[in-house]
Amino acid sequence: MKFENISNVWLLALILLLLNACSSTQTLTDKSILEQIKERGWLNCGVSGDLPGFSYVNLEDIEITKLDNDPNIPNNIYQQIQRSVVGFDVDICRAIASAIFDDPNAVKYRFIDTKERFEEISSGKIDVLSNTTTWTVERDVSIKIEFAPIVFYDGQGILVRENSKVRSLRDLNGKVICVETETTSQRNLEDEKKERNLTFQIRQLQDKRDVYRLYEAGECQAVTSDISQLATNLKLLENPDEHIILREILSKEPLAPAVIDSDLQWVEIVRWIVFALIEAEELGINQNNLEQKKASTNPKIIRFLGLKGTADSIGSRLGLEPDYAQRIIRHVGNYGEIYERNLGPNSSTPIERGLNNLWNNTEEPGLIYSPPFR
C-alpha cells in the first residue's frame, strides 16, 4: 500500500510537470508575430541579395558566396553586408520596420533562393518574404502563406544574344533554354513547350548564378525569367549590349511579399503597410512634403496620417502606432519614391513603370491601387 501511494505521488508530480511544460510552450507559441518582432528588436526579412534593383548587396569587394547565411562570416563583414543591402524589395522590408520601430534599419536580411523561400516562412526563420515572388493559386492554397498586395506587375520574358537572330520562342526549337528551378518560369516554359509542340530543351538550375554563367558560356542559347529579373541581370553580363529581351511575353507574373497565414493580425499589418505606400503616392505625400502635409485640413490626409492620434486610428486598430504611415513616409517615402529610387530612369537598373503606374495616372494609367483608408 505504501509503495502504491509513493507511485501515485510520483505519477501526480509527473503529470503536473508535463502540464506546466505544455503551458509554458503554449504561452510561448501564443505570442503574436508582432510581439515576437518587438521583443527581439528587429524584423527578419527574406530577400534574394543578388538581383540589382530589387535586392542587392552594394559592395564590390564582397564575394557573392558571402551571401549564403554562412555562420562563419566574421561579424564585421556580416554587419557590413546587412548595411549595404539595397533595392525595391529591401525597401518594402524597411517600410515594415519603420512602421513598427520608427527605424528602417531594424531589419536583418536572410539571403534565400527560390527553392527554400517558402520553407523559410513556414519555419519562422523569416517574418516576411520580399523576394520577387509570383502570387499563384497553388501557392496561395497549398502552402501556409498569405500574400500581401501586389507590388510589381511583371511578365515572363526571354533573353537571347542579339546576333542569334532568335526573335520568338519558336525560334529556339532544337536549342537549350536555361531556367531557375522551383519557379513559375520553369512551369510556364514546360506548359508552352507541351501546348505548342515545341522541341527546345529545358535545363533547370537551382542557382540563378549558374543560369547566367552557362548562358554566357554558350551552353544554353536563352534564359527565361520575369522580365524585371532579365532586365536587371542583363546589366551584370560581360557585354550587356550584345543581348536583348524578346518582345514575346509568356505569362502574367504578379509579384508580392508573403507572410505565414497563421497570424491574421500580422497578415493585416503587412497588407496595410504596403497599401500605405500606395495611398501616400495617391495623396501626394512624400518625404519632402510630409511635415507640410501634417498641417492639412483634408480629412483623408488627417485620417491617413493618424493626426488625431486617437485610440480608434487606423494604426491603433492594426496594433501599430497612430502615426505608422508617417513613419513609413519619413524613412522610405511613398511607392513612387521607392520605385524611382530603385528602378527609375536615373537608377542603375531602369525599368519603365508601365502597369506599375498608379491607376489614376493621366498619361499611362497602371494597376497600382489601394483600397480606401477609412
Predicted region positions:
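C-terminal motif of bacterial Sec signal peptides marking the signal peptidase cleavage site
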Residues: 18-21
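Extracytoplasmic small-molecule ligand-binding "clamshell" domains
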Residues: 27-131, 320, 335
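Extended ligand-binding regions for polar small-molecule ligands
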Residues: 23, 27-28, 34, 92, ...
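Sec-exported extracytoplasmic/periplasmic mature domains
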Residues: 38, 97-105, 122-126, 134, ...
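Bacterial N-terminal signal peptides that target proteins for export
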Residues: 2-10
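Ligand-binding cleft/hinge of the Venus flytrap
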Residues: 56-64, 68-73, 79-82, 94-105, ...
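Bilobed "Venus flytrap"/periplasmic-binding protein-like clamshell domains
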Residues: 44-53, 78-100, 134-135, 154-210
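Acidic, polar ligand-binding/catalytic clefts
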Residues: 62, 94, 98, 102-171, ...
